[in-house]
Regions:
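Non-catalytic signal-transmission and effector/linker regions of two-component phosphorelay proteins
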Residues: 1-14, 121-133
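The feature encodes the CheY-like receiver
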Residues: 67
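Active-site residues of response regulator receiver
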Residues: 63
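Conserved acidic segment of CheY-like receiver
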Residues: 12-23, 28-32
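Short hydrophobic/Thr-rich beta-strand motif most characteristic of the beta2 strand and flanking loop
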Residues: 36-43, 51
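As written
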Residues: 71, 106-113
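Acidic catalytic/metal-coordinating carboxylates
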Residues: 44, 70-76
Length: 133
C-alpha cells in the first residue's frame, strides 16, 4: 500500500490531492510543486478525511474512486459544517470521463468545481487552480 507523501514548496497555497492512481498524483505533484504549491497526496479516503480535518488546505483535489470510502462520501463529510467547522478549502472533483454523470446534481453543488482527468494537462491544471480564490 502506498504511503501519504508531501512535496513541499517554499511558499504558496496548500493542496491536498486525494488520488489513488500513482501516475496521476505524480503528474500533479510535479506540475503543482514547480508552480509553487505545497502538495500533500493521500490515496485512502478515510486518511484523507482526517488530513483535511486536522490541516488547513487551500484546495482539495478529490478523486471519486478511492479506497476505503468513496470521494462522494469524503465530499459529504467535508461539507458537513458540524464535522469540519474550520474547513475553508475549495474542493475540486477530479474524475474520469465515465464518471462525469455521477457528479451531476447534489455532488456538483457541493463541490467548487470539477475536472475530467483525460481532458486536462498538468499545465492546464496549474492554470485552472491559479484562478481559484
Amino acid at each position: 500500500m502506498e504511503q501519504t507523501f508531501t512535496a513541499p514548496a517554499p511558499t504558496g497555497k496548500k493542496i491536498l490531492c486525494i488520488e489513488d492512481e500513482h501516475f496521476i498524483s505524480e503528474l500533479y505533484v510535479r506540475a503543482l510543486t514547480r508552480a509553487g504549491y505545497d502538495v500533500t497526496v493521500e490515496v485512502d479516503g478515510r486518511r484523507a478525511l482526517q488530513l483535511a480535518k486536522t490541516n488547513q488546505f487551500d484546495i482539495i483535489l478529490l478523486d471519486l474512486m478511492i479506497p476505503s470510502i468513496t470521494g462522494i462520501e469524503v465530499l459529504r463529510h467535508l461539507r458537513n459544517k458540524a464535522e469540519t467547522p474550520k474547513l475553508h478549502a475549495k474542493i475540486i472533483i477530479t474524475t474520469n470521463l465515465e464518471q462525469r454523470e455521477e457528479i451531476r446534481g447534489d455532488i456538483e453543488k457541493q463541490a467548487d468545481g470539477y475536472l475530467v482527468k483525460a481532458e486536462i494537462t498538468p499545465r492546464e491544471l496549474v492554470e485552472f487552480l491559479g484562478t481559484i480564490r
